[in-house]
UniProtKB/Swiss-Prot annotation:
Subcellular location(s) of the protein: Nucleus
UniProt organism field: Ixodes scapularis (Black-legged tick)
Protein name, per record: U1 small nuclear ribonucleoprotein C
Protein family (similarity comment): Belongs to the U1 small nuclear ribonucleoprotein C family.
A Pfam entry, by short name: zf-U1
Length: 150
């Protein structure tokens, strides 16, 4: 808690709320700390602190990178190969493929109704080739820019 005694007249100051509490009693402090505005102020305080920490980390990383203390990513400046992931079985030509419904060894097919129709084709995941500008490469980290609230 950020309660500081201000004077001997039994008033306490809450740094989060920038306000004085009327009495030096646990019940007054508890009531104040359970209040909606106090909770919002505490949340805002720590949110702002986290944004400052993230910005400090970004600034330190940028300075270290410019000073040559950090090497570029292993994926940077490497061409992306033309290898493709094979399409799912549902997109291959021919009749739909199903896994055989077989139980434990030597038992034959399992009884019961056959499952319904195969699901529709899955959407393509994009074409192979170089990534567009401003796209992150694997291994890159992302720290969003802090939003300054006035």
């Amino acid at each position: 808690m950020f309660f500081l005694p201000v004077c001997t007249c039994c008033r306490y100051y809450c740094d989060y709320c920038d306000t004085y509490l009327t009495h030096d009693s646990p019940s007054v402090r508890k009531t104040h700390c359970n209040g909606r505005k106090h909770k919002e102020n505490v949340k805002f305080y720590y949110q702002k602190w986290m944004e400052e920490q993230a910005q400090n980390l970004i600034d330190a990383t940028t300075a270290a990178f410019k000073a040559g203390k950090i090497q570029s990513s292993q994926y940077q400046n490497k061409p992306i190969s033309g290898a493709m992931i094979p399409p799912p079985a549902a997109l291959q030509p021919g009749p739909p493929q199903r896994m055989p419904l077989v139980g434990p060894p030597h038992m034959g097919p399992m009884p019961g109704p056959m499952p319904g129709p195969m699901p529709g084709p899955m959407p393509m995941m994009g074409h192979p080739g170089p990534m567009p500008p401003n796209m992150m490469m694997p291994g890159d980290s992302f720290f969003p820019a802090p939003k300054h609230v006035h």
